[in-house]
Amino acid sequence: ILIIGGTGYIGRKVDVVISAVKFLPSEFGNDVDRVVFVKEEDIGTFTIK
């Protein structure tokens, strides 16, 4: 499982999660099945763990 880690709240709105996924390298994009700790101001600053 690839997890996008940020510093916000679990369960943010789906549109924010989708926006965050767009910033992933394309080779990971289709393999993401969990996004946690998403905060709008953190979009684009995520790391793969």
From Swiss-Prot:
Its EC number is 1.3.1.-. GO terms for cellular component: cytoplasm. It is found in: Cytoplasm. Its main location: cytoplasm. Keywords: Cytoplasm, NADP, Oxidoreductase. NADP(+) binds at G5, G6, T7, G8, Y9, I10, G11. It comes from the Eukaryota. It is an enzyme of class 1 (oxidoreductase). One of its GO terms (molecular function) is oxidoreductase activity. Belongs to the NmrA-type oxidoreductase family. Isoflavone reductase subfamily. This is Isoflavone reductase homolog 2. It comes from Pseudotsuga menziesii.
